[in-house]
């Protein structure tokens, strides 16, 4: 079925590792990162009573599905060409999904890319914030030299709209 095919594609994120290590010393998967930012959206729903936090949670769950096709490329190494390739492959896959999922995902991805709504801004802030938290939880011996400086500022602009998220990032 179309549903099983879509789930099979998404299952690839379980085996797609990210740059960051877990506190247990192994590489984190993209699926784990997506799960945790969705959990963060659930935990923080009362911090943003005017926002549609169910939509934020959906954004968090789907935000890295493009990495099913390209793998994870760390933010510090991702080029405009990498982003373009990932987006093209993702949108091609989304177009193959059954309706109404196809339309909802396309709408969510467009909103996430524009970063104009509060929901998109919250999702993006949580995405960056989770990466900072994950790095802080991992053994510092797993860090690359350039990450020490990057960790000091990564995601600051994304959380600046929210005093709560700014404080959490500190």
Model feature map: region roles:
Residues 1-170:
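Active-site helical microenvironments for divalent-metal-assisted chemistry
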């Amino acid at each position: 079925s179309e549903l099983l095919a879509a789930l099979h594609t998404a299952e690839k994120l379980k085996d797609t590792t990210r740059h960051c290590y877990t506190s247990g010393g192994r590489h984190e998967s993209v699926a784990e990162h997506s799960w945790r930012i969705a959990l963060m959206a659930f935990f923080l729903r009362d911090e943003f009573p005017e926002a549609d936090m169910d939509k934020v949670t959906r954004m968090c769950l789907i935000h890295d599905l493009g990495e099913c096709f390209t793998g994870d490329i760390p933010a510090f190494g991702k080029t405009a060409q990498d982003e373009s390739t990932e987006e093209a492959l993702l949108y091609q896959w989304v177009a193959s999904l059954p309706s109404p999922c196809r339309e909802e995902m396309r709408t969510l991805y467009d909103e996430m890319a524009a970063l104009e709504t509060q929901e998109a801004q919250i999702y993006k802030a949580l995405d960056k914030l989770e990466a900072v938290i994950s790095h802080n939880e991992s053994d510092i011996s797993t860090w690359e030299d350039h990450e020490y400086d990057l960790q000091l500022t990564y995601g600051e602009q994304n959380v600046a709209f929210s005093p709560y998220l700014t404080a959490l990032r500190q």
